[in-house]
């Protein structure tokens, strides 16, 4: 009598990791149905318990079916769970930053074993804290790709996501006020500068010349341009050109005396103190003439009458001209009993008296209406 034949059909589990536990054999069919089934994993000991699989793995299962009066049969199958595709999602995939302000986004899944790189660290860098990625702008404007990568694990493949960071340079707020005033003999800064950020580098150029970090100053009357340039890494350089003006001051002029009387043929003098060189002239040279030596003004009588001596302090680099007046009266000498004997004289013979000739005990002299 021959043993019966057992029919054994088995379907192994082959799938992708899904976090669920599965029978190692997804289907098993045996005839007769009451045959005894035993399982061996990778050639190990047999057990009546169905093997399970959950995590990514690969192994063999041998199934043995037996029953009294039947020939024992077996089959070996390969069980396999493949890695699932890694999961990586970002709350944002692009953003614009203006130096020095940063921005951030979150990783919504799988924050373990994450690495972050930047395509250009001069433009932007990134760091991870928990599930938050902070993007910091560099000092160079442009675009940088922030790449987030999860490492391969037992059950998941590596996954990559990218964030495009656009970085703009920051803005410098530059406010410049030029000096405008009247000459006062003191030195002044050519401009007043206010800048944000306060540590920006400030440079100055006078009339388009070479830049210098030294603040230009102004004392004397002048007019010139100052270009102020503010710069800092990560910021757009800003500049502005302003005109500096120092105007002439009003001239000053004072006289030691402002009027006088001269008895012909005498002279008189006074001093003039001014902000420029001194000159003078007479309104009537038939009465008086004037000369200047340094700051001394000498008035010489010519004939009886009145004249105005105009004194001028000249315009110069820092002062406007200034004038002042000196009033002079010229008189002849008064005849007295000590003047001697006087005779009328017609010097040029035209019938008009030109003067009087005086004679005393000591000398003889002639006064000819302005001549002696």
Name each region found by the language model.
Residues 332-345:
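An edge-strand/N-cap motif at the start of beta-rich repeat modules
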Residues 19, 346-357, 365, 372:
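Acidic, glycine-anchored loop motifs typical of Ca2+
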Residues 1-333:
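Solvent-exposed beta-strand/loop surfaces, strongest in extracytoplasmic domains of secreted
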């Amino acid at each position: 009598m021959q043993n019966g034949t057992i029919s054994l059909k088995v379907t192994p589990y082959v799938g992708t990791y899904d976090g669920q536990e599965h029978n190692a054999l997804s289907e098993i069919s045996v005839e007769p149905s009451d045959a005894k089934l035993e399982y061996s994993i990778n050639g190990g000991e047999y057990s009546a318990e169905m093997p399970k699989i959950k995590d990514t793995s690969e192994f063999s299962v041998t199934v043995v079916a037996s029953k009294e009066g039947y020939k024992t049969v077996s089959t070996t199958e390969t069980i396999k769970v493949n890695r699932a595709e890694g999961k990586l999602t970002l709350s944002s995939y692009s953003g614009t930053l203006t130096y020095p302000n940063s921005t951030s986004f979150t990783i919504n899944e799988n924050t373990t074993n994450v690495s972050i790189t930047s395509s250009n660290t001069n433009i932007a860098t990134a760091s991870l804290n928990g599930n938050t990625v902070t993007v910091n702008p560099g000092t160079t404007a442009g675009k940088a790709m922030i790449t987030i990568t999860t490492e391969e694990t037992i059950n998941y493949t590596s996954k990559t996501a990218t964030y495009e960071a656009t970085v703009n340079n920051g803005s410098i707020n530059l406010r410049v006020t030029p000096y405008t005033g009247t000459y006062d003999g003191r030195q002044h800064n050519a401009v007043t500068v206010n800048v944000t950020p306060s540590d920006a580098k400030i440079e100055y150029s006078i009339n388009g010349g070479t830049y210098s970090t030294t603040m230009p100053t102004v004392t004397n009357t002048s007019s010139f341009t100052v270009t102020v340039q503010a710069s800092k890494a990560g910021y757009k350089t800003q500049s502005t050109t302003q005109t500096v003006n120092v105007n002439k001051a009003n001239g000053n002029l004072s006289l030691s005396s402002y009027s006088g009387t001269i008895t012909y043929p005498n002279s008189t003098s006074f001093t003039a103190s001014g902000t420029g060189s001194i000159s003078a002239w007479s309104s009537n040279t038939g009465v008086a003439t004037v000369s200047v030596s340094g700051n001394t003004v000498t008035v010489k009588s010519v004939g009886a009458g009145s004249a105005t001596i105009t004194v001028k302090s000249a315009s110069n680099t820092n002062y406007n001209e200034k004038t002042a007046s000196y009033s002079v009266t010229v008189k002849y000498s008064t005849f007295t009993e000590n003047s001697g004997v006087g005779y009328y004289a017609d010097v040029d013979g035209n019938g008009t008296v030109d003067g009087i000739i005086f004679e005393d005990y000591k000398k003889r002299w002639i006064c000819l209406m302005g001549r002696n």
